[in-house]
Amino acid sequence: HQLRNTEPLNLYLMLLDIDRFKLVNDTYGHLIGDVLLRTLATYLASWTRDYETVYRYGGEEFIIIVKAANDEEACRAGVRICQLVDNHAITHSEGHINITVTAGVSRAFPEEPLDVVIGRADRAMYEGKQTGRNRCMFIDEQNVINRV
């Protein structure tokens, strides 16, 4: 599979992972964990803009494909999503759960295999997890990772 860009904007892949999701499952149970995942998916779908598309990737991970003019614009989208998640509690039958996500953003270059783009975004996201969570990280074409 490859990501194809047919417009003048660049394509970016944002990989989101719910921080400490295992703790949610261990504390509240898998049913509440499932409610959290479904609710977050609904939130993400409502928060994405016309040039962004959200997908459930698996487990507690989501992918957002972002069309942006440049790296900075794509990074702003990542920060916006992380802040929205941080500012909206998930309501369930027993109350509310405050969650955060860590995001990794990578540009998808023309004809580049999807797994390569996901791998780069995953490395950026992992770096964000290792350096504190609840943040957005960008990985550039030289594989340099920076917090945004």
Per-region residue spans from a language model:
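Residue-level recognition of strand-loop junctions within catalytic nucleotide-signaling folds
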Residues: D26, I65-A69, D86, A108-F109
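A short pre-motif secondary-structure segment
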Residues: T53-R56, I97
